Structure formats: structure tokens, C-alpha cells
């Protein structure tokens, strides 16, 4: 396995699986989406630390949605609890202003963002303006899902934290426009969802991604991000290790140890 991550639960992925999913037209599974969210969290932590700041957003994993949709008692599930608290989380989740969750339903991926500073849920659906059905119909389905997830996140906060009591009433669910140029095909919704999760800056995107070459570029960017996963206990081929972790960095690590 090229990448193995053990917190908050064990997941792994092989080089062949990465190749199959990240090639043109490849579709991601829950494992790839989970590893992507974990990697984005690591990158956010490093960025915040470099600026001497705290982490400002918290990424949840896609299985959160799966447990909610099955009507599991999420307040009793260790895996769900460890998405919010645990020794592997080295920042204060209760001080994050956003919670980010990749959501899959109707065989398509979207990104949901809970913005605590604005008391809004942003639903970033890359297929919203494809034109194959009305925006109203799509929004109605999303609102139902968002309401269920909203109540579940509120339950998790009440169950897993002491002293964090955000007002979760009367939040608005918003559907930003202009996220995608052109038509987003179903097979590409997952790469848009990861891009939107990474690049949403509160009211707009930091970087756009367009159909065609832009999609393939986003896939390759994600590959580089994933191969740089910290605390990876998998067996990454030496040629990639040498590219991602130059000898100079290895020597510095040895000296520090």
C-alpha cells in the first residue's frame, strides 16, 4: 500500500488504486475522499502554524454522511467521536470558523460547509447549473440532506465538547453560483468537490477549475498532495520519496533526531 493513515480510523490505498481513480475519467471512492480530507487538514495546520495562527477550518470525513443516512446513533460511535476530538487532533476544533464535509448522494459529490461566523451552510454543488433539471429541485434535495447533517453536527458538539455551545438555530442554506464553467459530468463531481473544499474562502473560490485540462490538472495536483501525506506508514516507492522529501530534508530530520 502506498498510503496508510490510521487516525481517526485505518484506511489504505495502493498505487494501482490511485492510478485508476486519478486518471482521466476515474471516479473516487470513500477511501480516496477520506485521505484527501485528512491531507487538506494537514496542509491547513501547516499553513496556520507558519503564520502563527490557529487552524480556521475542520474537515470531516465522508463516512459521517453515511452514518447519518443509516440513522446510526452517531453520539455512540468511536469513529465519529474521533472525527472531532482525540490525541491526533492538535488544534482547537471549537475555535474553527468552518466545518467542511464532502457529501455524496444521487451518485454525485458536493461539498457542504458550515460557516459559524455567518451562521450559514454553503452547499457547493458542481452540477447545480448543468441545466438537466431545475435549480429549485436540486436545492430542495440538498436542503433536506443539509438539515439532517446540521442536526447531527449539533448532536456531536453537544456530545463531545464541554463549553462549546454555538447557536445552531435559524441557519440559512446557501447555494453559491459561478462555481463551475461549463458542464460538470458526474464522473468529475468528486474532483470538483475536493477542489471546492480546498479552495472555498468564505464567500468565493481562491482558485477556479474549468472543464477539460483544468480537471486533469486538479487530479494531478491532488496526487502530489496525497503523496506528501504526513505520518504515512505506507510503502511509497523510492522515486517518489526522493522527489517529495529531498536528501537535504532527510539529513535535517536525522540531525534533529
Q: Locations of the language-model features?
A:
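Enzymes acting in ubiquitin/UBL processing and closely related pathways
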Residues: 1-257
